[in-house]
């Protein structure tokens, strides 16, 4: 998505970049990734990565139920005929909560401001949104990739003071952090396992 974004910028006409139908929950035709490659959880993480590239995603419905699949309900989430077995968009709710908590439309991808596998959207000097994909349990030296996968992550900031908070991409839990100072900040370890996001806003 970042590459497509750069190609579009070079045309001089900036338009939204959309990843269409990147995943249908539990859709496993012979040419698709094997389970759990299209699970609700994997697609939730994919949606975060698309959003952190400054792009939009359009998601399909469950391939297990709905139109032409017993019990044929005639649809799913989009037309209100889904059921409790369709869980993918439940995970997306937290992503919406995160992005609507700041002026996301004023930010641009700035992955050069972070390292070691993190993603960053920023309006430098004002807003920094950082996403940390799932990392291994980093307290165990038994992890084969411990030294590589558990390296610290730094964020380059414009000078100033920023309010900061963790946001669980899985549960929506918010964990406030002490004020952060630029120009370089080493992120603390996330409060829990799985993937987390960070939001920093300049203190006025």
Put a short name on every predicted segment.
Residues 1-3:
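Extracellular/periplasmic bilobed ligand-binding domains
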Residues 6, 14-17, 25-27, 39-178, ...:
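Aromatic- and carboxylate-lined catalytic core of secreted/periplasmic carbohydrate-active enzymes
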Residues 9:
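Extended glycan-interaction surfaces of carbohydrate-active proteins
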Residues 30-37:
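The substrate-binding groove and active-site-proximal loops of carbohydrate-active enzymes
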Residues 183-185:
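Short strand-edge motifs at loop-to-beta-strand transitions and within beta-strands
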